[in-house]
Structure formats: C-alpha cells, structure tokens
C-alpha cells in the first residue's frame, strides 16, 4: 500500500495497525483464525505480525518512508511453509538467534487447498474497502527481467 503523506512519521503506527487489521480480515474471510500480534518464538518478531490462532506467523509487515509518501509492504506466506523453515533454520543458527521453527506457517496450513488467487482476491477486496485500488500490469520486459534474475534468489529445493 503506497499513500501520499505530508508528514510520514506521524502516521507510522496507524498505517501498521490498519494494514495488519486489513490482512487479518482478508484471511478471516477465507476461514483463518487470523489475529494481529507477535507469536512466541517467531522469526523477525513484531507486534504487527499477522498470525493464525496466536500460534504461527503468516505475515510480516514493514514500512518505507520517503518525503511525501509511505509504503507499507506485507510478506504473506500462502503455501509451502516448510520451505520457509528450511531457509530460516540455518540462518538463525548461524546468527545465534533464538527461533522456533514451529512458529512459522502458511495460509495453506490453516485452510488446506487454498489457492493463491483466492488469497489475492480476498486481499484486493479488503484493500478496496479502504483505498482506491489501481491494478498495474507489469510490462513483458519487466516480467522477463524478473524471471531471468529469479534464479539468483531462489533457495535450492531438496
């Protein structure tokens, strides 16, 4: 969510709150016991984590502020929670940080068979209740560039 803001620092907490609640509502619409709040043992802990039943982290939220604009981004794990755990276990071990792999989940773990398109539709619906949503299609050149670079960022799948 990107919004024009005259004084970006003043609305930081409110933006975190509204986006976290919006994501939780979108997931609740799909049948997830979605809540906002830190999960014990979660990776990258934060009070605006969107979780399932207070047990597992599903989404993290961050903000980027520049003069005149605020961007609130959400990383939501929809499928393949085991891949997230496989990547994070060695990272947290190397860093010497505490983390409970059981605290990491995905929407699919809560609603078996859920499809990405269903999650996208629910989030877009909830966004449209509070914001003017303007879908933007990426150009074929941008999509090609992303696809060709993706291999550098993918974790190996065993």
What is each residue range found by the language model?
Residues 1-40:
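Contiguous, small/hydrophobic- and glycine-enriched helical/loop subdomains that border
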Residues 30-32, 64, 68-158:
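Long, positively charged amphipathic alpha-helical accessory segments at protein N-termini or as interdomain linkers
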Residues 1-2, 50-52, 76:
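Short beta-strand element of the conserved SAM-dependent methyltransferase core
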Residues 6-8, 56-65:
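Acidic, His- and aromatic-enriched active-site or binding-groove loops in soluble protein domains
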Residues 3-6, 55, 80-83:
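Short loop segments at secondary-structure junctions
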Residues 36-58, 142-147:
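Beta-rich nucleic-acid/ligand-interaction surfaces
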Residues 13-20, 24, 44-47, 55-58, ...:
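Hydrophobic, well-ordered secondary-structure segments
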């Amino acid at each position: 969510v990107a919004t024009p803001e005259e004084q970006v620092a003043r609305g930081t907490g409110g933006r975190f709150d509204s986006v976290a609640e919006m994501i939780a509502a979108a997931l609740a619409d799909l049948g997830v016991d979605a809540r906002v709040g830190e999960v014990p043992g979660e990776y990258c802990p934060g009070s605006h984590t969107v979780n399932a039943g207070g047990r597992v982290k599903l989404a993290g939220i961050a903000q980027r502020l520049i003069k005149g604009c605020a961007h609130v981004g959400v990383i939501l794990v929809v499928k393949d929670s085991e891949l997230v755990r496989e990547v994070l276990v060695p990272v947290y071990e190397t860093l010497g940080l505490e983390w409970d792999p059981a605290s990491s989940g995905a929407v699919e773990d809560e609603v078996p068979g859920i499809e990405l398109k269903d999650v996208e539709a629910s989030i877009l619906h909830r966004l449209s209740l509070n914001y003017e949503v303007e879908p933007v299609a990426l150009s074929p050149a941008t999509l090609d560039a992303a696809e060709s670079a993706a291999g550098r960022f993918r974790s190996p799948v065993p």
